[in-house]
Amino acid sequence: LRRQRQMCIRDSNDEIISTGYNGAPRGRINCTDAGRCARVEMKIPSGERYELCRSVHAEANAIISASRRDMIGSTLYLVGRDAQTHELLTNATSCSMCRRQVINAGIERVIIRTGDDTFNIVDVDEWVKNDDSAFWIE
C-alpha cells in the first residue's frame, strides 16, 4: 500500500453523509496487513494500472455507502498520507476512475488537504470540462 486516503462526503446542510478509506474489499486482507503490495512488486509507477490494486479507493468506498440523492450538490473532503511515513501528501488528488465516480454521484466540489492549513478546492464541473479520459477524441 503506497498511500492512505480518508475522506468524507458532507451534504449542503454540512452533515456527514458518508465516509471512506483505501482498503481491501470486505473480508479480504489489506496490503498493509499482508506486508506487501503487488503493484510495488511489479514496479508499476504510482498513478498507473489501478485495476491491479486490490484496494477500493476512499472515494469509491464513500460513494458506495451513500445514496445518490444525498450526494447531489455535496462536498467531498479528501486527505492523503504516505502509508509508510504517515506524512501528509501535498499532491493528493482523485484518480481518473474515482473522478468519474464523483461526477456520476452528483458531488459538486472536492476539497483536498494539501498542508497543515492549506487546501485545494476543485469544482467538479472542471473535471467534466477537462475530460482526462477523452485523449482519443479530437
Residue ranges and their predicted role:
Residues S18-E138:
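Zn2+-dependent cytidine deaminase-like catalytic core
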